[in-house]
Regions:
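A conserved helix-loop-beta module that forms one wall/lid of the active-site cleft
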Residues: 43, 74-149
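ATP-binding N-terminal substructure of ATP-dependent carboxylate-amine bond-forming enzymes
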Residues: 1-86
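Short amphipathic alpha-helix with an adjacent loop that forms part of the alpha/beta core around
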Residues: 47-54, 123-127, 152-154
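Short, solvent-exposed loop/turn elements at beta->coil junctions and helix N-caps
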Residues: 46-48, 120-123, 137, 164-166, ...
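Phosphate-binding site of ATP-dependent enzymes
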Residues: 141-237
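Flexible loop residues that form catalytic
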Residues: 13, 63, 121, 137, ...
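A short beta-strand motif that forms the metal-chelation/ATP-contact edge
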Residues: 55-60, 135, 175-177, 184, ...
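C-terminal active-site "lid" helix and adjoining low-complexity regulatory extension at the edge
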Residues: 230-277
């Protein structure tokens, strides 16, 4: 049974050079607030496996793309699953945590997602487009993303990358959840400055869209971000379901929503650590 103040190992790469944002500021703020309720230590993702046995739970936050330390992450994941270590988010997520296969699965299942294939013979299944997006299955932060012609997309589509039509969207919007509870939404009104986010008030239809993916993923405890784009016909299409270490852009929300998010995270984390519903 965890102590009255559970021990949390908080995993973050404070020096990760994110474009247009400072991951470290967000984690400095979050850890300062979590310390009000938990005994907390912070470590680099490369050190997590060696340290985690001394803690009641591991919280993975802004740890950077796992491509930069894939062998280390795979070892951490294997050891945590074998030992039954409580990892927040749980390592059973079906979104980005497991790679980009879910984009293919959701496309095949008819979900409202940017259509995605990985084989040249499946390109005819995509809407006709003048340009196509090619990206790696384990990509993050646009690492390895290319915009190419149809011929180049066909050459690249060998099963190791994903191919999507280039969507001329109006804007991108993100929905942030703790467990299955919606917290806030942000959008990038200027497509040429996609890192500059502003508060967004979602409609009931917007929230219904986002909740479809939260329900599909069945992550009972944790933080998820549903990234979408507003297509030319006005509909929303899923771009990414981030369930490993979603950046939260807490600096873009007001104090009231920031405090509400922290409170929701504390409640979720305590329930997760104690094993309560």
């Amino acid at each position: 049974m965890p102590a009255e103040r559970p021990r949390i190992l908080y995993v973050s790469d404070l020096a990760y050079p994110a474009r247009g944002r400072r991951y470290c500021d967000e984690d400095i703020h979050l850890t300062s607030r979590l310390r009000e309720d938990f005994d907390l230590a912070l470590c680099h993702p490369r050190d997590a496996a060696a340290l985690m046995d001394a803690f009641d739970a591991v919280v993975v936050r802004n740890s950077g793309p796992v491509l930069g330390y894939l062998d280390v992450y795979d070892d951490f994941r294997r050891r945590a699953l074998a030992a039954g270590t409580r990892v927040y988010n749980p390592l059973t997520g079906k979104g980005d945590m497991a790679g980009k296969q879910y984009l293919l699965d959701l496309t095949a299942a008819g979900f409202p997602v940017v259509p995605t294939v990985d084989r040249a013979e499946d390109l005819p299944l995509l809407p006709d487009a003048g340009r196509y997006v090619v990206k790696p299955r384990l990509g993050a932060d646009s690492i390895g993303l290319r915009i190419v012609s149809r011929d180049k997309a066909a050459e690249a589509a060998d099963g190791t990358v994903l191919v999507q039509p280039h969507v001329d969207f109006a804007y991108e919007v993100s929905f942030y959840f703790v467990d299955d509870a919606f917290q806030y939404a942000l959008y990038a009104p200027h497509t040429d400055r996609r890192w500059q986010l502003e508060p967004y008030e979602p409609t009931a239809a917007d929230l219904e869209f986002a909740r479809r993916f939260i329900d599909w993923n069945t992550v009972r405890h944790g933080i998820q971000r549903v990234d979408a784009c507003r297509a030319p016909d006005g509909s929303l299409l899923l771009v990414e379901l981030e369930d490993l270490n979603p950046y939260l852009s807490l600096d873009a929300v007001d104090d009231t929503r920031r405090d509400a998010f922290v409170a929701a995270m504390k409640t979720s984390l305590r329930r997760f650590v104690t094993g309560s519903a």
